[in-house]
């Protein structure tokens, strides 16, 4: 038997029952400075083995007596935890889990036991499961892993298999994010390649972008350190395209169009790439909204130094870049892929293989999926703590 301690700072999210709950209470140290009874803190973990578990709540700061409602909706569990100065480790009783899967535990402060004048709700550090026979029976984001990437959730990829990889100069992909699956932080990347990526993002409640970036050949996360001979150079851009440099995930040239794309619409992305005679390779991205135009719009064209390449390593991905929304599921469809070589000969896209990032590979998060829908094309899904699917890394999907 062993005890499993699940840290709030790596595995919890907050939601609000009122229109205005602006404070963020979740830090790596736990849930801190929590005053609002309209805020619900939700902690997630995955159980691989059914069984009975004792649970307790660990705090390392209690300012005054307070009461927190603890509920597990899927188990019809409800408990009122009353804290005083002696309640740094408070037993919540036992739970019985009959089926493997994700468990969500909600915490909400009661209005009657807290007053802004007298201090905060108790600081929540960890939820402890006791009587665990096998440590590997409980999966969650470990403190040894990045809380940023763990709370973001797993990124998932489709790696396209073409009948030929030689001299691919043009690639087209259609991407649709279904209605209600477009949470803030979503990046449905339509066309990735060895030197950059191109797709659409939800950047906030009020802004969405069509983003195209190309990496510099100099390996650095600091764009200001790139030597002049390693700079990615802008060749041309669309009328309303914004141009920046980027860092923290490699560095290079960034271009984006602020655009109010809509969930449920299939948008068209086209990428051209070829080696120039000047030692650069040229990469140009175009976007088309089928609801508004029959023509593609130029996003930007970049040239990359010390590179002689057509389009290689073609893939798509779905990620969440906002750690505060990793508890919300995303989904995207990728359809009608077309490839052409430098002689404009069509190259068949035969299939797509599934892969994921370290968050999934190290089993910090299990909420990922991918496959094929013969009507809507290949799909990717991630985040939201849905129960694990049977898809595995390396699975190959083919459309009829």
Task: Outline where the language-model segments fall.
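Extracytoplasmic
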Residues: 1-260, 268-275, 279-400
């Amino acid at each position: 038997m062993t005890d499993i301690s699940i840290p709030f700072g790596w595995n919890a999210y907050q939601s609000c029952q009122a229109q205005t709950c602006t404070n963020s209470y979740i830090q790596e140290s736990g849930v801190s400075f929590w005053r609002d009874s309209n805020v619900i803190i939700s902690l997630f973990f995955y159980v691989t083995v059914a069984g009975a578990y004792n649970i307790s709540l660990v705090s390392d700061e209690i300012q005054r007596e307070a009461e927190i409602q603890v509920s597990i909706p899927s188990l019809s569990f409800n408990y009122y935890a009353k804290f005083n100065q002696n309640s740094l480790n408070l037993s919540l009783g036992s739970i019985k889990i009959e089926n493997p899967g994700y468990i969500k535990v909600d915490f909400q402060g009661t209005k009657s036991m807290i007053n802004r004048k007298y201090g905060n709700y108790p600081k929540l550090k960890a939820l402890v499961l006791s009587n665990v026979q096998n440590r590997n029976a409980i999966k969650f984001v470990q403190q040894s892993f990045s809380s940023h990437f763990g709370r973001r959730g797993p990124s998932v990829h489709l790696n396209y298999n073409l009948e030929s990889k030689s001299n691919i100069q043009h690639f087209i992909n259609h991407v649709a994010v279904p209605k209600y699956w477009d949470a803030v932080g979503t990046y449905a990347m339509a066309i990735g390649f060895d030197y950059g990526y191109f797709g659409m993002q939800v950047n906030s409640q009020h802004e969405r972008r069509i983003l195209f970036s190309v990496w510099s050949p100099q390996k650095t996360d600091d764009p200001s350190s790139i030597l002049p001979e390693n700079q990615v150079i802008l060749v041309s851009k669309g009328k309303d395209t914004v141009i920046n440099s980027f860092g923290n995930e490699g560095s290079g040239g960034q271009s984006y169009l602020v655009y109010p794309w809509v969930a449920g619409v299939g948008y068209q992305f086209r990428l051209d790439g070829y080696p120039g005679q000047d030692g650069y390779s040229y990469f140009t991205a175009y976007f088309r909204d089928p609801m508004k135009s029959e023509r593609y719009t130029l996003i930007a064209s970049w040239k990359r130094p010390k590179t002689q390449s057509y389009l290689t390593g073609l893939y798509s991905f779905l990620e969440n870049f906002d750690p505060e929304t990793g508890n919300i599921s995303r989904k995207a469809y990728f359809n009608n892929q077309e490839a052409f070589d430098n002689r404009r000969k069509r190259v068949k896209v035969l299939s797509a293989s599934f892969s994921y990032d370290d968050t999934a590979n190290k089993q910090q998060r299990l909420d990922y999926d991918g496959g094929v829908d013969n009507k809507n094309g290949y799909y990717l899904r991630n985040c939201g703590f849905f129960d694990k699917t049977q898809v595995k890394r390396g699975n190959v999907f083919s459309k009829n």
